Curated annotation (Swiss-Prot):
The lineage of its organism: Bacteria, Bacillati, Cyanobacteriota, Cyanophyceae, Synechococcales. This is tRNA-specific 2-thiouridylase MnmA. Residues 173-175, 328-329 are annotated as: Interaction with tRNA. GO terms for biological process: tRNA wobble position uridine thiolation. It catalyses: S-sulfanyl-L-cysteinyl-[protein] + uridine(34) in tRNA + AH2 + ATP = 2-thiouridine(34) in tRNA + L-cysteinyl-[protein] + A + AMP + diphosphate + H(+). ATP binds at G26, L27, S28, G29, G30, V31, D32, S33, L52, G138. Pfam families: tRNA_Me_trans (PF03054), tRNA_Me_trans_C (PF20258), tRNA_Me_trans_M (PF20259). HAMAP family: tRNA_thiouridyl_MnmA (MF_00144). Keywords: ATP-binding, Cytoplasm, Disulfide bond, Nucleotide-binding, RNA-binding, Transferase, tRNA processing, tRNA-binding.
Amino acid sequence: MPSEETVEKTLKRLQTFSGSHSVVVGLSGGVDSSLTAALLCKAGWDVEGLTLWLMKGKGSCCSDGLVDAAGICDQLGIKHHIVDSKEIFQKEIINNVLKGYEEGITPLPCSRCNKSVKFSEMLKWVKENKNIEKIATGHYARIRYSNESFNENDLPSDGIKRHKLLRGKDLNKDQSYFLYDLPQEILGKTIFPLGELTKEITRIEALKHSLKTAKKPESQDLCLAEHYGSMNAFIDKYLPQKKGEVVLKNGQIIGSHNGIQHFTIGQRKGLGIAWEVPLHVVEIDASLNRVIVAPREDSGKSECIVKDINWVSIEAPQEPIEVEVQIRYRSKAMKAKLIPIFDSNKENYCYKCNIHFEKDQFSITPGQAAVFYKGDYVLGGGLISKEY
């Protein structure tokens, strides 16, 4: 579909929302959130901008982002609000990430930040400013609201109306993987105007609107890595090095390391080991301060346990279901059977599950998200557990 038609379709959809048409846009200072605000203004919404100040210093979540976001609000003629969220970001993200690395997992700060910081802080602000009806961000994802009618014959149905999360149309930019943990209350309040657009169209439209951020380079890293220079620099600032062993699966010691926090499942580079075949990290044992390695052909797993599940587009299943599971951002979702594990304290509630993949998967990484899909629909998701 030509870009003009896609944008017109987006504008028409934005104009169909019922209510007062007041919205606050989460502005990072990047082109995506900038165009989001511009499109909502064009669609006739009463728009205000809000930026969360997460860290001191340079970067998209820091001072640079605040300046660019303020510039966009000035250009569009809308109010700009700044919320000091450094304390909650330290507690929910930085502390949690460091704890994860100490435990030998690879944390996923982006999805946690979306739920526990960005969207929760925006929702809190909206509740305190009752003249604002909706939240909008520049994420590439889509929402089907509980009062909308769509063909959902491929989804399990229990008759309960739910807000449903879908992949963005641009599969190269789809961010639904990082949004699986958003609760129904937030989904019902949120708009993703870029959900039907590609990144290319976003750039074109930003230029058409002469937005100051239209040519701003896209951030290529996690905000923590961007802020500290690299994830290793961030980790080294807070976690002490602790020498340990690198071993094969049979326990044979073949090398040493300076801290398990510098390793992740599947890693090959940076092991500092010369071996007859390339070796990959297959397990990180925090209790023994050990990194276990193996050849790639001996690194696959066919199943994993997923915990802390949030069910999005469906209610928690009561029996095994066939799904596609994505275990890394931008990786392909693979066919699998989801077997519910029930909480004895909550009758018939699936709080974690066993995932059985049709084919062995390389680098199933504890701490990362496993997100369950049915076509474009996000059924739910959770964190990959260290237990097997």
